[in-house]
Design a protein with these regions (language model features):
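Cell-wall glycan-active module
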Residues: 1-300
């Protein structure tokens, strides 16, 4: 590891680096199948796959930063107390595929408690450790990290659990926000405003790495006010400007493999035809999925 790494926290640890989940055609096909079986849209798959290129693949594991133990294709974390997003993925597999969970984790001494904390059997002492003590044990003993690497490489059920948990924890498009339009509060979903693949991926990047998109309503209100927007249809025309303002790690507006928002109208040319009632909006995002439930990475 570099001596001065932005999130470096521990004098020892593991950094299991592997290619992103969509590097080869076979991996890409498997990832697509996992998202399809989970009932998650192709737009969501493309967004998560783009972020995976910044995070890792299903087997990627590291224990050196403020997430403490970071695992998988979008780097789920334990956090210091052993109750972070990784536990959501473990619970998903344990609930949906108990036999696979027993094979992947329980037989190696890794489990989760009923109140959502990770537990491990210390390979050195045989003691059962819970929460913060379990996290420290994983950081200190690479053999426990190896369990996650092995499951990420060979277990289709663990990969599927990662996909489902990632969507449940990090999908930002169904969140409700309140905007000020013509001086009146208007409640809408994020997907009523951002509908392009590049825009969705930009927001997902923030949600995964920062844990939230709390700046989004302020950005939208500022841009809406600057352009005199009175309806959601007006605001939608400025999606590209909104997405540019929400950029985080990567400028996805330059990604040729993602659908892009339209250029905004020339200043002063906002169509009066757009100023119609948005009740019964038919223009809802194609990425607003049929309702499935849905860092700073201490950071998350």
């Amino acid at each position: 590891l570099p001596e001065r790494y932005a999130y470096y926290r521990f004098p020892r640890g593991v950094n299991s680096v592997s290619a992103p989940a969509t590097t080869s055609s076979s991996e890409g096909d498997q990832t697509k199948e996992l998202f399809t079986e989970a009932g998650i849209s192709d737009a969501a798959r493309k967004a998560f796959s783009a972020i995976s290129k910044l995070e890792g693949t299903f087997e990627a594991s590291q224990t050196y930063d403020t997430g403490y133990v970071s695992i998988g294709f979008i780097q789920f974390t334990t956090g210091p107390d052993g109750d972070g997003s990784l536990i959501r993925a473990l619970i998903d597999e344990k609930t949906a595929s108990p036999d696979a969970f027993a094979e992947d984790f329980h037989r190696y001494g890794i489990d989760v408690t009923s109140d959502g904390k990770i537990t491990v059997i210390d390979p050195k002492s045989g003691a059962e450790l819970i929460g913060p003590d379990a996290v420290k044990c994983i950081v200190d003993d690479p053999r426990l990290v190896g369990v996650f690497v092995h499951a990420g490489r060979f277990s289709i059920k663990w990969k599927a659990a990662q996909v489902r948990a990632a969507y449940k924890v990090y999908w930002p498009m169904d969140a409700e926000i309140t905007l000020q339009l013509s001086g009146n509060p208007t409640v809408c979903k994020v997907s009523d405003i951002v509908q392009s693949e590049a825009g969705i991926t930009t927001l997902l990047d923030r949600k995964i790495n920062r844990g939230n998109i709390r700046e989004f309503p302020d950005v939208v209100n500022r841009i809406a006010k600057a352009h005199g927007c009175e309806t959601l249809s007006d605001i939608q025309m400025y999606e590209k400007e909104i997405v540019a303002a929400m950029r985080y790690r990567v400028d996805f507006l330059k990604a040729s493999d993602l659908g892009q928002p339209a250029d905004p109208p020339t200043e002063g040319k906002t169509s009066n035809a757009s100023r119609t009632s948005d009740s019964g909006r038919s223009n809802r995002s194609t990425a607003s999925l049929p309702s499935r439930a849905a860092k700073p990475r201490s950071k998350r």
